[in-house]
């Protein structure tokens, strides 16, 4: 069972601040080892995770499974868009949704990434993830992204 955490309405200066926040939050939740926050920052620097979709940009930061204690996903919707470097070039994209992945094994990570990429190609799902009230976000993400077989 994957832990799912959601948070909206936080302002960040830049992606470094976002990644630091994610690292601190996941440490506080007890789902990562103390090596995870720095590993997340290092991996994002080497392998950027910003993705421009049809209507919105997102980022899916993650790092090696060795740094995880248990599986989790952290959905973070910053107050203002935050620039992340795109995964496929040197340009930045203004991200309105961050989906941080904490996984315990590489096969699980690959499966989860494939699932996410498939669902995030649907503009209506992305729009809903960005605009839905925070109180409904966990249920929606679980039902329409994680548990959906479509």
UniProtKB/Swiss-Prot annotation:
Keywords from the UniProt entry? Cytoplasm, Galactitol metabolism, Kinase, Phosphoprotein, Phosphotransferase system, Sugar transport, Transferase, Transport
Is Cytoplasm given among the entry's keywords?
yes
Which InterPro entries does the record cross-reference, listed alphabetically?
Answer: PTrfase/Anion_transptr, PTS_EIIA_type-2_dom, PTS_SugarTrans_NitroReg
Under the heading Gene3D superfamilies, the entry gives: Mannitol-specific EII, Chain A
Summarize subunit and interaction data from the UniProt record for this chain.
Forms a complex with one each of subunit of GatA, GatB and 2 subunits of GatC.
Domain remark text: The EIIA domain is phosphorylated by phospho-HPr on a histidyl residue. Then, it transfers the phosphoryl group to the EIIB domain.
Q: What is this protein called?
A: PTS system galactitol-specific EIIA component
- Source organism of the structure: Escherichia coli (strain K12)
Taxon lineage = Bacteria, Pseudomonadati, Pseudomonadota, Gammaproteobacteria, Enterobacterales
């Amino acid at each position: 069972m994957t832990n799912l955490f959601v948070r909206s309405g936080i302002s960040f200066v830049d992606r470094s601040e976002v990644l630091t926040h994610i690292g601190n939050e996941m440490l506080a939740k007890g789902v990562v080892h103390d090596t995870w926050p720095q590993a997340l920052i290092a991996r994002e620097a080497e392998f950027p995770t910003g993705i421009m979709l049809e209507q919105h940009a997102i980022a899916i930061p993650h790092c090696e499974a060795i740094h995880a204690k248990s599986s989790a996903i952290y959905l973070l919707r910053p107050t203002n868009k935050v620039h992340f470097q795109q995964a496929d070039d040197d340009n930045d994209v203004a991200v309105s949704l961050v989906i941080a992945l904490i996984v315990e094994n590489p096969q699980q990570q690959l499966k989860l990434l494939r699932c996410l990429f498939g669902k995030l190609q649907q503009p209506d799902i992305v729009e809903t993830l960005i605009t839905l009230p925070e109180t409904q976000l966990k249920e929606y993400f679980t039902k329409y992204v994680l548990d959906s077989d479509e």
